[in-house]
Amino acid sequence: MEVNILAFIATALFILIPTAFLLIIYVKTVSQSD
């Protein structure tokens, strides 16, 4: 169970970090365009 939890956390971070990074860039781009 612990391994599954760690794998879930690792996967979540692996997905969320790049997504958040792209989201920040997108927001900045929209703000500059507007």
From Swiss-Prot:
<keyword id="KW-0812">Transmembrane</keyword>
<dbReference type="GO" id="GO:0009535">
    <property type="term" value="C:chloroplast thylakoid membrane"/>
</dbReference>
<keyword id="KW-0602">Photosynthesis</keyword>
<comment type="similarity">
    <text>Belongs to the PsbM family.</text>
</comment>
<dbReference type="GO" id="GO:0019684">
    <property type="term" value="P:photosynthesis, light reaction"/>
</dbReference>
<keyword id="KW-0793">Thylakoid</keyword>
<keyword id="KW-0150">Chloroplast</keyword>
<comment type="function">
    <text>One of the components of the core complex of photosystem II (PSII). PSII is a light-driven water:plastoquinone oxidoreductase that uses light energy to abstract electrons from H(2)O, generating O(2) and a proton gradient subsequently used for ATP formation. It consists of a core antenna complex that captures photons, and an electron transfer chain that converts photonic excitation into a charge separation. This subunit is found at the monomer-monomer interface.</text>
</comment>
<keyword id="KW-0604">Photosystem II</keyword>
<dbReference type="Pfam" id="PF05151">
    <property type="entry name" value="PsbM"/>
</dbReference>
<keyword id="KW-1133">Transmembrane helix</keyword>
<keyword id="KW-0472">Membrane</keyword>
<dbReference type="InterPro" id="IPR037269">
    <property type="entry name" value="PSII_PsbM_sf"/>
</dbReference>
<dbReference type="InterPro" id="IPR007826">
    <property type="entry name" value="PSII_PsbM"/>
</dbReference>
<protein>
    <recommendedName>
        <fullName>Photosystem II reaction center protein M</fullName>
    </recommendedName>
</protein>
<keyword id="KW-0934">Plastid</keyword>
<feature type="transmembrane region" description="Helical">
    <location>
        <begin position="5"/>
        <end position="25"/>
    </location>
</feature>
<dbReference type="GO" id="GO:0009523">
    <property type="term" value="C:photosystem II"/>
</dbReference>
<comment type="subunit">
    <text>PSII is composed of 1 copy each of membrane proteins PsbA, PsbB, PsbC, PsbD, PsbE, PsbF, PsbH, PsbI, PsbJ, PsbK, PsbL, PsbM, PsbT, PsbX, PsbY, PsbZ, Psb30/Ycf12, at least 3 peripheral proteins of the oxygen-evolving complex and a large number of cofactors. It forms dimeric complexes.</text>
</comment>
<keyword id="KW-0674">Reaction center</keyword>
